[in-house]
A protein has these predicted regions:
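N-terminal membrane-anchoring alpha-helices
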Residues: 1-47
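N-terminal Rossmann NAD(P)H-binding glycine-rich loop of SDR-like oxidoreductase domains
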Residues: 40-77
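NAD(P)H-binding glycine-rich loop region in Rossmannoid oxidoreductase-like domains
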Residues: 49, 55-56, 90-93, 97-148, ...
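Short, polar loop motifs at secondary-structure junctions
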Residues: 83-91
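Conserved Rossmann-fold NAD(P)-dependent oxidoreductase catalytic core, especially the SDR/UDP-sugar
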Residues: 87, 132-190, 194-199
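C-terminal helical subdomain
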Residues: 226-254
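Flexible, glycine-rich beta-alpha linker
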Residues: 172-173, 194-231
Length: 277
């Protein structure tokens, strides 16, 4: 039936055009300029090192946390680096020999308040999935553990708290994942850190050791789209981590910063942009 087939092609083509239009809109919309800086990034990093700041990382065993720890040590931005987790991690590389490890029971965090004392900057990369931990377990990790850790960090003197959240986070969302992410963002903000930075990455482009079929499928589907529209629906994990570190040295005067996926790309690629200019 030519007419039916033609209608199918027309509908399929229309859907494809709509997807491309939406993607292009997301690619082009929103701020894309680099932050205005009185100094170049390398100078800002040198100035930051002179401050002898200390930091802690929550979730250093996860993909973002592992990459973050690696880049922090390579950059030598902090004079002291502590990872806080439920178990001690084994490192073979000599570069990790000075990393401090605080092993805590997240169900009894009040008993481990000392682990959160004396840090200038905190990075929270804690997270699990409903598929892995169940609904209650997901809420406990992504909300309860994160919020309690932030409370202890604030009490311990942390000035700048960085939270890895998710694209689409919204405390009013009907989707559990996005609602919980939005709720914890709002509740951590209420703690009143001197500086609170929220990172909302889209799909992270990374090959996880942990099996997450839905993320694997999403990465495969998004790979060609990411090539054409790199900032719309995904972000390489290395770019996210570089954005976290670049954000720290930029010393923004904003108390609360919300960085969506496109802003993460911009911040994470500052070195490349400086080299081109």
């Amino acid at each position: 039936m030519p007419g039916v087939r033609g209608s199918g092609y027309w509908i399929g083509g229309s859907i494809l055009v709509l997807i491309v239009a939406i993607t292009l809109h997301q690619e082009l919309s929103g701020p894309s300029e680099l932050p205005r800086m009185a100094k170049d990034l390398q100078t800002l990093r040198e100035d930051f090192r002179q401050l002898n700041k200390s930091c802690f990382i929550l979730g250093a065993s996860g993909e973002t946390g592992k990459e973050l720890l690696k880049q922090i040590l390579q950059s030598r931005l902090f004079s002291k680096v502590t990872i806080v987790g439920r178990r001690k991690l084994d490192f073979e590389d000599e570069a990790y020999k000075d990393v401090n490890q605080e092993v805590v029971d997240f169900e009894k965090l009040d008993e481990y308040s000392s682990a959160f004392q004396g840090h200038d900057v905190g990075f929270c990369c804690l997270g699990t999935t409903k598929a892995k931990s169940g609904e209650a377990g997901f809420i406990r990790v992504d909300h309860d553990y994160v919020l309690k850790s932030a409370q202890l960090a604030k009490a311990g003197g942390c000035q700048h708290f960085n939270l890895e959240s998710s694209k689409g986070a919204n405390k009013g969302s009907s989707f559990l994942y996005l609602r919980v992410k939005g709720e914890v963002e709002a509740e951590v903000e209420e703690l009143g850190f001197e500086r609170f930075t929220i990172f909302r990455p889209a799909v992270l482009m990374v090959d996880r050791k942990e099996s997450r079929p839905s993320e694997w499928f999403a990465r495969k589907m998004l790979s060609p789209i990411s090539y054409l529209f790199p900032t719309a629906y995904s972000v390489p994990i290395t770019t996210l981590v570089r954005a976290m570190l670049n954000s720290a040295v930029l010393q923004s005067d904003k108390r609360v910063e919300l960085l969506e996926n496109k802003a993460i790309h911009t911040l994470g690629k500052m070195e490349e942009q400086e080299q081109k200019s």
